[in-house]
């Protein structure tokens, strides 16, 4: 209620503190005086939050590490990225509220439902804002953002994961019929590309020798979704593995049997409350009771998802012979599953560089790179774009014989392009991300926007 806020501020009885950029914008737009929670955190605390999140996502290594394993794949590891997406913004709010409470411990607090859960662990003198409003529990991978481009306009919309998978399964009926590996002999060796974008890698696919022995395995994304992806697959003659190629009665039974054990495994892995309360803490404040319910729900959801994916991947590696497997990440759930199972089948795995990485020697950067899977851990070799990244890999302990410099397959086709008559400027920048504590600050968000605006102003006048 903005009018109530304005009146309270005028009476000097309210201090308004925002915890997100949207609220900050709304209050600014209505000229309502407020503070931002970022002002209660210094740089060291933000860096500590980031470091702590990287540590906490490895919780499964500390207590009963084998309890969450299924066919040699640890389900706790598969949810590290998604758990980090949740933890970083949560910890930032948690620490900020601790600091605010330390300054105003005798105050009466009012907070939104998510923040109320934190404040009530510190004081009983707190009430909920919008108490009757419904809050939907949603995790990062519960929905999928679908990008669309119409002429020169780009936009995106969100689909629930379940709806997305239903649409994907429908489309894969036709994909299996026209591009499935049914003509491939099961003992004929092939190369497996995992979660590859056929548009981005179309030149690589079309120029590869024996492209018919290349198989694409995309579980998170559709392999064909528009005319460009269709043409890329058709031109390359590579094969696409879908659920319709692998599913049978035995596989269905294995999945159901695996899913039946989830409840017991989750309960057992989270049975040591004393450990969990001590482990999930920061600055001597435990937050386990705040996240316990959400965390259990997340673990159950992802355990069920993972069992299905592990069984499907196992069937794939049993049905076909692969001379090698190529992944562009070791942290994606599909990639982790395939890489772990490949070890059992003695199939070599190659990690392909997929982006420009920060290569400074700062501790925080190195920690981030390791978390994001920049360096091969389970892969046998890595392919990098050039000698800069090769040196970066060498400095971080990767053996030279395990590094190949082969350039960037994204841009192979650009060499033969004529220079365009119309000048274009490509602004290749990534904005602030929710899994980085410093990126979540209002200062970083506004600085990023101001920088882009300034670049546009300057380049427009060139």
What are these regions (language model features)?
Residues 1-462:
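Catalytic-core helical/loop segments in enzymes performing group transfer/polymerization on anionic/lipid-linked
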């Amino acid at each position: 209620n903005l009018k109530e806020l304005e009146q309270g501020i005028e009476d000097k009885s309210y201090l308004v503190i925002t915890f997100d950029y949207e609220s900050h914008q709304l209050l600014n737009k209505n000229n309502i005086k407020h503070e931002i929670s970022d002002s209660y955190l210094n740089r060291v605390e933000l860096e500590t939050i980031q470091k702590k999140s990287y540590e906490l996502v490895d919780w499964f290594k500390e207590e009963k590490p084998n309890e969450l394993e299924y066919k040699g794949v640890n389900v706790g590891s598969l949810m590290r990225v998604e758990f980090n997406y949740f933890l970083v913004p949560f910890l930032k709010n948690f620490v900020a509220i601790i600091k605010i409470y330390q300054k105003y411990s005798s105050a009466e607090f009012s907070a939104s439902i998510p923040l109320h859960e934190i404040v009530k662990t510190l004081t009983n003198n707190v009430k909920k804002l919008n108490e009757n409003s419904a809050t939907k529990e949603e995790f990062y991978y519960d929905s999928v953002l679908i990008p669309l481009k119409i002429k020169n306009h780009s936009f995106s919309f969100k689909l629930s994961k379940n709806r997305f998978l239903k649409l994907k399964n429908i489309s894969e009926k036709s994909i299996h019929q026209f591009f499935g590996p049914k003509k491939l002999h099961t003992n004929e060796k092939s190369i497996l590309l995992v979660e590859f974008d056929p548009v981005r890698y179309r030149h690589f696919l079309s120029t590869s020798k024996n492209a018919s022995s290349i198989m694409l395995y995309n579980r998170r994304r559709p392999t064909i979704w528009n005319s460009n992806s269709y043409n890329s697959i058709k031109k390359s003659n590579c094969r696409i593995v879908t659920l319709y190629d692998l599913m049978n009665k035995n596989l269905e039974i294995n999945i159901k049997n695996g899913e039946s054990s989830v409840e017991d495994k989750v309960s057992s892995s989270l049975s040591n409350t004393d450990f969990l309360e001590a482990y999930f803490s920061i600055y001597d404040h435990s937050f386990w009771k705040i996240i316990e319910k959400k965390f259990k729900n997340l673990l159950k959801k992802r355990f069920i998802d993972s069992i299905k994916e592990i069984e499907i991947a196992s069937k794939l590696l049993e049905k076909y012979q692969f001379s090698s497997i190529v992944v562009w990440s070791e942290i994606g759930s599909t990639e982790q599953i395939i890489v772990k199972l490949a070890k059992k089948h003695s199939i070599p795995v190659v990690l392909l560089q997929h982006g420009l990485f920060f290569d400074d020697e700062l501790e925080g950067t190195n920690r981030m790179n390791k978390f994001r899977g920049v360096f091969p851990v389970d892969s046998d070799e890595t392919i990098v774009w050039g000698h800069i990244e090769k040196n970066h890999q060498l400095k971080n302990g990767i053996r030279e014989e395990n590094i190949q410099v082969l350039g960037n397959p994204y841009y192979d086709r650009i060499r033969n392009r004529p220079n365009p008559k119309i000048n274009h400027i490509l602004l290749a920048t990534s904005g602030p991300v929710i899994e980085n504590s410093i990126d979540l600050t209002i200062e970083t968000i506004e600085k990023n926007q101001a920088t882009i605006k300034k670049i546009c102003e300057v380049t427009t006048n060139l």
